[in-house]
Amino acid sequence: MDSMNVPEVLEIKRIVEESESVKTFIFSWDFRREVRPGQFVMVWDFRDEKPMSVSLIDPVRSEIGISIRRVGEFTDRVHGLSEGDLLGIRGPYGRGFELMGRDILLVGGGIGMAPLAALADEATARGMRVDALVAARTADELLFLDRLEAAGVNISTCTDDGSCGFKGFAHERLLTLEENHDMAAVCGPEPMMFQVMRILDERDVPAQLSLERYMKCAVGICGQCCLDDTGFRVCAEGPVFWSQELSRVREFGRYRRDPAGRRVPW
């Protein structure tokens, strides 16, 4: 069996509290298994297993980080762990982001900034100019601002309640930005991404968007994360898709499926 498909039990090296509800768990990593921004891993707490984005990729320190938002029983248990505790990590899986051109735009909402933070690190290390539109419901939920600033990223913020930056939604703030970009990478709530993609398509900016779906196997076998009507598997052909691909996906921005396969509107 491919060792990538067997969980490797790793010790939590460090824990960073990003916000009241988000923690980043940092592990030592053998980079013979390459990790790309936008890929995900399956995190196993010895009771259950869930897909999580990789938010930190540091080959110099041989470390990766996984940022986890506290939203339910599984994440409650993980948030209760301490440095030195163990988690199982399986992967990485899926298609990540591709960098192209010299000027790139990142648009992230909430925990959607996790894979974009890793992408920003790589882009700035390559000497690219990076603009980031960071959105959240309130100022306390804006993520990775210090890290992005330290990397030399040009940051714009927006919050639903106006507590930091522009008051409104990410797509509304995007309409006020006139910068030309060679590409865009987007991750966050799907209704937000749907609106952002429409604006980027109108501006002829090539866009890559990272989707989230309910997953079980992570290796393209179970079909749980297939998208209507294309059959794209989010765990295999995704989670990162080009906007041209998502324009063929009937459910994008409209509905998703629950663990039983029933449609759930956004």
UniProtKB/Swiss-Prot annotation:
<dbReference type="GO" id="GO:0009055">
    <property type="term" value="F:electron transfer activity"/>
</dbReference>
<dbReference type="InterPro" id="IPR012165">
    <property type="entry name" value="Cyt_c3_hydrogenase_gsu"/>
</dbReference>
<dbReference type="GO" id="GO:0050660">
    <property type="term" value="F:flavin adenine dinucleotide binding"/>
</dbReference>
<dbReference type="GO" id="GO:0046872">
    <property type="term" value="F:metal ion binding"/>
</dbReference>
<dbReference type="GO" id="GO:0044205">
    <property type="term" value="P:'de novo' UMP biosynthetic process"/>
</dbReference>
<feature type="binding site">
    <location>
        <position position="217"/>
    </location>
    <ligand>
        <name>[2Fe-2S] cluster</name>
    </ligand>
</feature>
<dbReference type="InterPro" id="IPR017938">
    <property type="entry name" value="Riboflavin_synthase-like_b-brl"/>
</dbReference>
<comment type="similarity">
    <text>Belongs to the PyrK family.</text>
</comment>
<dbReference type="GO" id="GO:0016491">
    <property type="term" value="F:oxidoreductase activity"/>
</dbReference>
<feature type="domain" description="FAD-binding FR-type">
    <location>
        <begin position="5"/>
        <end position="99"/>
    </location>
</feature>
<keyword id="KW-0001">2Fe-2S</keyword>
<dbReference type="InterPro" id="IPR017927">
    <property type="entry name" value="FAD-bd_FR_type"/>
</dbReference>
<feature type="binding site">
    <location>
        <position position="225"/>
    </location>
    <ligand>
        <name>[2Fe-2S] cluster</name>
    </ligand>
</feature>
<dbReference type="InterPro" id="IPR039261">
    <property type="entry name" value="FNR_nucleotide-bd"/>
</dbReference>
<dbReference type="GO" id="GO:0051537">
    <property type="term" value="F:2 iron, 2 sulfur cluster binding"/>
</dbReference>
<dbReference type="InterPro" id="IPR037117">
    <property type="entry name" value="Dihydroorotate_DH_ele_sf"/>
</dbReference>
<keyword id="KW-0285">Flavoprotein</keyword>
<dbReference type="Pfam" id="PF00175">
    <property type="entry name" value="NAD_binding_1"/>
</dbReference>
<dbReference type="Pfam" id="PF10418">
    <property type="entry name" value="DHODB_Fe-S_bind"/>
</dbReference>
<dbReference type="InterPro" id="IPR023455">
    <property type="entry name" value="Dihydroorotate_DHASE_ETsu"/>
</dbReference>
<keyword id="KW-0249">Electron transport</keyword>
<keyword id="KW-0411">Iron-sulfur</keyword>
<feature type="binding site">
    <location>
        <position position="235"/>
    </location>
    <ligand>
        <name>[2Fe-2S] cluster</name>
    </ligand>
</feature>
<keyword id="KW-0665">Pyrimidine biosynthesis</keyword>
<keyword id="KW-0479">Metal-binding</keyword>
<dbReference type="InterPro" id="IPR019480">
    <property type="entry name" value="Dihydroorotate_DH_Fe-S-bd"/>
</dbReference>
<keyword id="KW-0274">FAD</keyword>
<comment type="function">
    <text>Responsible for channeling the electrons from the oxidation of dihydroorotate from the FMN redox center in the PyrD type B subunit to the ultimate electron acceptor NAD(+).</text>
</comment>
<comment type="pathway">
    <text>Pyrimidine metabolism; UMP biosynthesis via de novo pathway; orotate from (S)-dihydroorotate (NAD(+) route): step 1/1.</text>
</comment>
<keyword id="KW-0813">Transport</keyword>
<comment type="subunit">
    <text>Heterotetramer of 2 PyrK and 2 PyrD type B subunits.</text>
</comment>
<feature type="binding site">
    <location>
        <position position="222"/>
    </location>
    <ligand>
        <name>[2Fe-2S] cluster</name>
    </ligand>
</feature>
<keyword id="KW-0408">Iron</keyword>
<protein>
    <recommendedName>
        <fullName>Probable dihydroorotate dehydrogenase B (NAD(+)), electron transfer subunit</fullName>
    </recommendedName>
</protein>
<dbReference type="InterPro" id="IPR050353">
    <property type="entry name" value="PyrK_electron_transfer"/>
</dbReference>
<dbReference type="InterPro" id="IPR001433">
    <property type="entry name" value="OxRdtase_FAD/NAD-bd"/>
</dbReference>
